Amino acid sequence: MVIKEYGGGMKRLAAVKSGEIKATAVNEPLASLAREQGVNVLVDLVPDQIPWLFTGIVVRHDDISARRDLLTRFLKASIEGNYIALTDEKRAKEVLAKELNITSAKTLDITYSDFKQQSPANLVPTTAAAQNILKLFPDASQKVGDYVDMSLLDALKNEGFFTAMEQKYKTQ
């Protein structure tokens, strides 16, 4: 099996349908569109409860210390935005509909449900999810710590930021 970058979701879906590629990973709303178009879904990470990292914040290692204040502010804003999305369904769906060009209420409901089930409120990646990604690259180091630096998130936890978000958005 060869794993390579192939472009955006719509391009990958078209390539699967044409036979140009054999399989691709998609999440909502493309997963629903793929099903509607008769594409066979091999794995659905949500109902199968498979830990996965769908997105991440990537910076050069040196920038973690050199630009720590900027990165901390960025993380705080991203985390609070995630709390808003998880606790204000109407607002989150408006953003999803606009940014992903979703016009179907059913697809919007599925997409939001998928997001809620997969997105940790505090954006902390799980070790299991990172390990599942690393398994795709057996020749690379399988040590999560070689790729994931938790120091900024650990600092936010230690300063009480996560607790403050839980209280503000009444998630605990």
Where are these predicted regions, by residue range?
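Short beta-strand-to-loop elements that line the ligand-binding cleft
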Residues: M1-G8
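Glycine-rich, flexible loop/turn motifs
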Residues: V2, G38, L53-T55, R60, ...
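Generic structural "secondary-structure junction" signal
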Residues: G8, V59, A66, P125, ...
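Pocket-lining segment of extracytoplasmic ligand-binding domains
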Residues: K11-L100
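Secondary-structure end/capping motifs
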Residues: S65-K143
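Conserved C-terminal helix/tail region of periplasmic/extracytoplasmic solute-binding proteins
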Residues: P138-Q172
